Swiss-Prot record:
Assembly description: Interacts ncbp1/cbp80.
Biased composition (Basic and acidic residues): 16-73, 277-337, 376-397
Role, per record: Acts as a mediator between the cap-binding complex (CBC) and the primary microRNAs (miRNAs) processing machinery during cell proliferation. Contributes to the stability and delivery of capped primary miRNA transcripts to the primary miRNA processing complex, thereby playing a role in RNA-mediated gene silencing (RNAi) by miRNAs.
Gene (name only): srrt-b
Residue stretches of biased makeup (Acidic residues): 349-359
GO molecular function, one term: nucleic acid binding
GO BP annotations, alphabetical order: primary miRNA processing
Name of this protein: Serrate RNA effector molecule homolog B
Length: 844
């Protein structure tokens, strides 16, 4: 009788047991070094599942293979792609048909517990963190903003009798009404939020201006102190002097925090300590190299007899070697315990601790005198140090005011105010300030918060305690904010060229003048008049803006057919020039750039302004400086292009806050305070009957409406003022040309026009538009079926397999698109075309 099916299968499985066990044993050592990540289980399961399906699919036509695949010898087999084995029409097979992502490869990542299977591949910008973690019920996604109709959609709602000019006029009116309605809805939705009121409410705007002006004066005083005490004389904004630049920025921060000259001494102490640490590391490195050299010299002197046991010990297992090492280390530790620890010398360092332990074990002889006198020498040193410490207690120690600790909170809802976060964090020791960023409309107006504490606190303990607190049913999710790593960053060294430096002086002087005038920084009051003083840093600045040339000498020499003696003969390309460095101009420019950075928080070479820097953890954080000289010569075109680019990028900093014109404001619905006050009075004048009128604000009754009106203006004047302030509040928001609003949701435009031309020009697919993330649960648009390329190709940029042929060369006939996303048309005509043959108009 034959064996059962189970016994037969077991025999087949055990056929290569020895081979498999040897293979697994070799892999065990590699797996020991790696952490056991539970996140990889999904990937292994997917790999096994795909292999199983592959085996089951072709089990009829092929014999099973039972030996394991060796990943360390050869890569795993790839699955063959067939025309009939395609899931292009099935939206839940998201291996290669990702229409909205820039990658056509399979989705590597654990499947998300929510939403469409393809959505976890997309970039989840704009999706709240709770939604990405699976807690979608905790998130209020809100109703999507209504989209404005296109002209074509608007025409469908009109009657056929409306002509073209009337339709255009009505569409313009529709656009104005739509924007007005959107603006009013946005105002009503956000008018009670702190960030919105601080921007536009008349009372809050005045307070905000006073605070910003006070902080500007504080920063100005810090800069003037540095300039008067020659802190800026020896520092240049070059990447080689990054340490000196950081020292100047830290000194400015110490002065902003109210520090004194004693507190500034801590910068010198830190500099000396850094030098000492560098010297320790260098000395440890030198001793290590000397030790290696001596060992190499002593190695050939060893007899051959000593080498024989070494060769015999080689095949010892690593486990036994580890046990021997542990046994050796235990008696060494016991011998070190009774002796006291040696004091560190100037040559010792933490980095060289391994080398120190090696030297102690290798040469025990020098330790014997230290063991005898190790107890006496520390006592003598302590006795000598004790009387010196007493006078130090009386002196004031410098404070590290430039260093802080901070907590970062990523998602603060707009309804939580700064005062609430301040009250929450004030209970912890060392609290200093709170900074809130501007709300982000694309992220549901969430804000980022930075809570700054003193350097002496345990910031991790505070962060942990804040993590367990909910504010208005919102988790703050704080994290410890790291210190800035690279505070000084460099840009192109072409900025050292003299014409560029002169142009930068001109732009920086203009920018300083514009920012000072906007902030009224140098305006003082003499009696009733406002007198503007000149910024001392701009004094005699025009002397450096004028270019001096030898025009007369060049003219006389050119008429005689000679060249000036000072001009060197040009070598190489005449259009290229060497970078000329002018130290005098650079010194003037650096003072202007330090003024912009310290006073106005403007990083000139980065062409940006750091907002609310006075409330941030580091009040002078980052600065961009000039890089090293370019190794090659530069062309005139590069110089002019650099000047043009930096002028364009600085243009927004020069621009004054734009407001709408009166006509545009009236079209958008600007309100009149007096008319709104009259409407308020009319709404609060109610007729009860004949000669009976009621004021609902107080509940009093009057004989006529004029008495109610008089009563409201006399007894409820504060209500009238509130109405007028509300009108001014709305008008301030309306007239701001850069007012915040909901991001417009634009529908995806089908490819046409230029896309068709691109296809005709030889491209396989039309250029891809900006990527857009679909709302939760919304199905993706249908992909084209038979005939032609799909509407959204799997990889329009050729970054994966399938698009290689179209990028092999320009001007060639495009290869066959290996598009396995959609099934090809079975009725398509198969043809052969000779590439060397002349063009034929009638080919298929």
């Amino acid at each position: 009788m034959a064996d059962s099916d189970d016994e037969h299968d077991r025999r087949r499985r055990d056929k290569f047991r020895r081979e498999r066990s040897d293979y697994d044993r070799s892999r065990e050592r590699e797996e020991r070094r790696r952490d056991d990540w539970s996140d990889r289980e999904w990937d292994r399961g997917r790999e096994r599942r795909s292999r199983g399906e592959y085996r089951d699919y072709e089990s009829r036509s092929r014999r099973d293979r039972f030996s394991p695949q060796r990943h360390d010898i050869s890569p795993p087999q790839k699955r063959m792609r067939r025309d009939w084995d395609d899931h292009g029409s099935d939206p839940y097979h998201s291996g290669y048909e990702m229409p909205y992502s820039s990658s056509a490869g399979p989705a590597y990542g654990p499947p998300q517990p929510w939403g469409h299977p393809e959505m976890h591949v997309m970039q989840h910008h704009g999706i709240p963190i709770q939604a990405r973690l699976g807690n979608l019920h905790d998130v209020d996604l809100g109703t999507p903003a209504p989209t404005m109709k296109t002209f074509k959609e608007f025409l469908l709602s009109l009657e056929d009798s409306v002509d073209e000019t009337e339709a255009v006029k009505r569409y313009n009116d529709y656009k104005i009404d739509f924007r007005r309605q959107q603006m009013q809805e946005f105002f009503l939705a956000h008018k009670d939020e702190e960030w919105f009121r601080s921007k536009y409410h008349p009372d809050e705007v005045g307070k905000h201006k006073q605070e910003s002006r006070a902080s500007l004066h504080n920063r100005l005083n810090a800069f003037m102190f540095l300039m008067e005490n020659s802190w800026l004389n020896e520092v240049q904004l070059d990447i080689a002097q990054s340490t000196a630049i950081i020292k100047v920025l830290d000194a400015a921060v110490i002065k902003m925090e109210g520090g004194t000259e004693i507190d500034l001494k801590i910068l010198d102490e830190e500099e000396e300590e850094a030098k000492r640490e560098a010297a320790k590391k260098e000395e440890a490195r030198v001793t290590e190299t000397e030790k290696v050299i001596t060992e190499e010299k002593e190695a050939p002197a060893k007899p051959e007899k000593d080498k024989e046991p070494e060769s015999e010990e080689k095949p010892v297992k690593p486990e036994e070697e580890e046990e021997k090492k542990v046994e050796k280390e235990e008696p060494e530790r016991e011998t070190r315990k009774p002796g006291t620890r040696k004091r560190k010398r100037s040559g010792d360092s933490d980095d060289g601790s391994d080398s120190e332990s090696d030297t102690e074990t290798a040469s025990p002889k020098p330790e014997t005198p230290n063991q005898n006198g190790c107890e006496d020498t520390p006592k003598k040193e302590e006795e000598t140090e004790k009387p010196k410490e007493k006078p130090k207690e009386d002196t004031v120690k410098p404070r590290p005011l430039h260093k802080t600790c901070s907590i970062f909170m990523r998602n603060i809802p707009p309804n939580i105010s700064k005062a609430e976060i301040t009250a929450l964090c004030k209970r912890y020791p060392g609290f200093m300030r709170v900074a809130l960023s501007e709300p982000q409309p694309e992220r549901r107006f969430l804000r980022k918060a930075y809570v700054t504490f003193d350097r002496s606190v345990n910031i991790k303990e505070i962060c942990w305690s804040v993590q367990n607190i909910r504010l208005r049913e919102c988790e703050l999710s704080p994290g410890v904010n790291r210190d800035l790593t690279y505070r000084v960053r460099n840009i192109n060294g072409i900025t050292l060229h003299r014409p560029i430096v002169r142009n930068d002086i001109k732009l920086a002087a203009r920018l300083i003048h514009a920012l000072d005038e906007r902030a009224q920084l140098w305006e003082g009051e003499q009696g009733d008049q406002v007198v503007s003083a000149q910024n001392p840093i701009l004094k005699n600045i025009t002397d450096y803006l004028i270019d001096e040339v030898n025009a007369e000498e060049e003219e006389l020499l050119s008429s005689a057919g000679r060249t000036p003696e000072t001009e060197a003969p040009k070598e190489g390309n005449p259009t290229e020039i060497t970078v000329e460095r002018d130290e005098k101009l650079i010194k003037v420019l650096d003072k202007l750039l330090f003024y912009l950075r310290i006073v106005h928080s403007v990083d000139y070479y980065n062409t940006c302004e750091y907002p609310n820097e006075d409330e941030m953890p580091t009040r002078c954080g980052m600065m961009h400086v000039r890089g090293p000289l370019p190794p090659n010569r530069v062309s005139h075109g590069e110089v002019t292009e650099w000047q043009k680019t930096i002028e364009e990028k600085l243009a927004p900093l020069f621009a004054v806050r734009e407001t709408l014109s009166e006509d545009e404001a009236m079209k958008m619905g600007k309100k009149d305070p007096e008319q709104e006050a009259e409407k308020f009075v009319t709404a609060n004048t109610q007729e009860l009957g004949k000669e009976k009128w009621l004021c609902p604000l107080s509940g009093k009754k009057f004989k006529g409406p004029e008495f109610v009106r008089k009563h409201i203006f006399n007894k409820h004047a504060e209500k009238i003022e509130e109405v007028k302030k509300e009108v001014e509040f709305f008008n301030n928001y309306l007239t701001d040309s850069k007012r915040p609003a909901l991001p417009e949701v634009k529908p995806l435009q089908p490819p046409g026009g230029a896309a068709g031309q691109a296809l005709a020009a030889g491209l396989l697919y039309p250029p891809q538009g900006p990527q857009a993330l679909l709302p939760y649960g919304q199905p993706r648009p249908p992909v084209l079926g038979y005939g032609g390329a799909p509407q959204f190709p799997p990889n329009p940029y050729g970054a994966g397999r399938g698009n290689y042929d179209s990028f092999r060369g320009q001007g060639m006939y495009p290869g066959k698109p290996r598009n396995r996303m959609m099934r090809g048309d079975p009725r398509s005509i198969i043809e052969y075309r000779d590439l060397d043959a002349p063009d034929d108009v009638d080919f298929f």
